[in-house]
Amino acid sequence: MKATQTLPLKNYRWKGINSNGKKVSGQMLAISEIEVRDKLKDQHIQIKKLKKGSVSLLARLTHRVKSKDITILTRQLATMLTTGVPIVQALKLVGDNHRKAEMKSILAQITKSVEAGTPLSKAMRTASAHFDTLYVDLVETGEMSGNLPEVFERLATYREKSEQLRAKVIKALIYPSMVVLVALGVSYLMLTMVIPEFESMFKGFGAELPWFTQQVLKLSHWVQAYSLWAFIAIAAAIFGLKALRKNSFQIRLKTSRLGLKFPIIGNVLAKASIAKFSRTLATSFAAGIPILASLKTTAKTSGNVHFETAINEVYRDTAAGMPMYIAMRNTEAFPEMVLQMVMIGEESGQLDDMLNKVATIYEFEVDNTVDNLGKILEPLIIVFLGTVVGGLVVAMYLPIFNLMSVLG
C-alpha cells in the first residue's frame, strides 16, 4: 500500500453551543471536516454552522510539516515509549501540544486509527507520505517483534544523523553559489550603470580606445540590450531541465553523474550518498528487516539517481546469490575501503556494525570538507572575483592611462 499524500490544510469557521448552552464560535485549521467535528465533539460543542475557507499562504507555510518535524516527533515517541508511556497516549501528548496544525491533523488521524485497532505502521502509512517506506517498514518490524521503543530509538538516531548530513551538504552548495551570484550581480551593475558613464567620458577623448576596452564596451551594450532575454532563456532552460529530469530517468541519471564530477562539491555529494546508504542499510538490517528488503528500501531513499541505480544492481545480484561486497564492486560506485568493510561485515556476521562504521567515517569526512570549504575555495574565489570584477575595472582605466602617457 502506498502512503497517502497529506491533504492540504483548510480553514474551518464554526458556530455552535457549548455544554453550558452558551453560543460559541471560532475557526480551526484542519485537513478535513471530520477532524473538526471530532475535535469540537471532544470539547462538548454542538455544531450549528460549519464553513470551509481558504488558508493564507503565510499560514500554509507556517503550519507545513517538514522532514525535521518528523525527526523531532520520532525522538519524542522514542523517549516516551522507552519510559513506558503507551503509544496512544504518546501520540495524543505530542499532537495536543504541537504548534503546527498539519502535524496535529496527521497525529489525530493516526491516533484515531490506532484506537480503532489499526496497527501503528498501517495508520502512519495511510495518514501521510511524510512516513516513507523505510519508516513504516521499521515500525512494522518493531510491532511484530514487540520492540517498538528500540525501533523508534534507532529511527530517531538515523533521522537525526541524516538531517545533520543534509544540512552539511546544503551548506556546501550554498557557499559557492552565493559567491557566484554576488560576482554576477556586481558585474551586471558595473556593465549597466558604471561602464556607460565611462563610455560617455571616453567619447570626449577623440582617440581610438584599447582593444580590451572596446570588447568590454561591446559586452556592456549587449548586456543592456539582451540581459532580460538572457535571463528568460536561462530560466526557461532551468525549468526545461527540471521537466526533463521529472519525465526521463536517463536525464536524471546523467545529471546526477555530472553533479558528482564537480570539483569539491561532487566529492561531498558522493560521500554524503555513501554515508546515507550505509546508515540506512545498517538501520534497516539491525532492526530485523532481511538484507534484500533492506537494499530495496535503501535504494528508494538514496537521494541520488546514480547511487539508486547502483543499489538496485546490488539488490539484483545479491538476490541471485552473489555476496553483497562483490555485487557492490561490480557497480564501480563504491570506494575500495567501503567494499573491504562490507566484506568483513558479511564474513563476521556483523554487517550492521561495519555499515555504521562506514557511515560514521564518511559523515566525518563530509563534516571536515564542509567546515574547511571556506579555506579550500578562498583562493579560487579571489582569482574569480579578481578576473571578473578586476578585469572590468582595468578595461575602464586603460584609456585614461594611455591618455596620461600621451600628455606626459
From Swiss-Prot:
Function text: Involved in the translocation of the type IV pilin.
Lineage, opening ranks? Bacteria, Pseudomonadati, Pseudomonadota, Gammaproteobacteria, Vibrionales
Task: Name the Pfam families on file.
Answer: T2SSF (PF00482)
Cellular compartment(s): Cell inner membrane
**Gene Ontology terms: cellular component:** plasma membrane
Protein's name in the database: Type IV pilin assembly protein PilC
Transmembrane portions of the chain: 178-198, 221-241, 381-401
Q: Which UniProt keywords apply?
A: Cell inner membrane, Cell membrane, Fimbrium biogenesis, Membrane, Protein transport, Transmembrane, Transmembrane helix, Transport
Task: Name any Gene Ontology BP term.
Answer: protein secretion by the type II secretion system
Principal cellular location given in the protein's record: membrane
Recorded topology in the membrane = Multi-pass membrane protein
